[in-house]
Amino acid sequence: FTTVLDSTMLNASIIEALRCDQIRRIYFVGQGTAGIAAQACADILSYYLNDSKFFIDALKASELSGFKMSTHDSPDSMSDTLVIAISQSGTTTDTNRTVDMVRGRGARTLAIVNRRDSDITFKVEGVMYTSSGRDIEMSVASTKAFYSQIVAGAILGLHMAAATGRRDITFVTEEIKKLLELPAHMKKVLGQAKAIEASARRLAATKTYWAAVGSGPNKASADEIRIKLSELCYKTISSDYVEDKKHIDLSSEPLILVCAAGAKSSVIGDIIKDTAIFKAHKATPVIIADEGETRFDPYAEDIFHVPVTSEHLAPILNTLVGHLWGY
């Protein structure tokens, strides 16, 4: 397997700039759910490039434009930078304004967008269309957009890694196989919809305070679950790193959605220990874990197992459980 992106998506001059180390900084930007997808995409690209020469980060578009740039910047102050904007509608003011500002400082620009011929598509050098739902619509449910944005970011990152010689054809083939497995994995999670609904109906009203937690790539899952729970349930909900939660507000005895699927072996033991602490403080842990993982059982109020996938792709499956629980 290989990736094929034409020049309307990623042009040769950007690839050459990456290959020759003319681009050293790569930012994924967006707002809201697109900003969370940016976080997941940055984690994936860091894994794919696997090169400390690159500084790869995700920022809210408004943070990049508001606090990482100044009116005193020179016209080439970001000439070593690639900015990849993510937007469902292509009309998000903060994101589009940020693209204008980085271009004015010499940055190269790409976009991952759902709506064809939207404003942002005329501002950037290359566009990957996600086409979730009807891509002529201004608004498409951001649940669908979120998953496709992450996969688009993965394909883009994989292409960059291969084109610059940082990953070989064997690696690319295995990663594409993993991406192709995701729809079947997601269908398997959707098959648990009734059990997830039963959990939400049984537990949601028992706790005043809710939280979502995740660490590493799964912090993106926690952040996105928090957004949907807040939107759907009209509640202010926290999103924290798993290890940090015990230092924050366990005295409130919250209901905690723990995004643990895909966590690597060196970390999962600590997440289990932290979950035991949550339980000891009379919190209500609802766990999302890999199939076959039984060590959470003594501490989980409910546990949902998802198919095993790589750590960098696991946010998709963790988030899907959280989305269903929220609905």
Regions from the PLM with identified roles:
Residues 1-327:
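A SIS-like phosphosugar-recognition module
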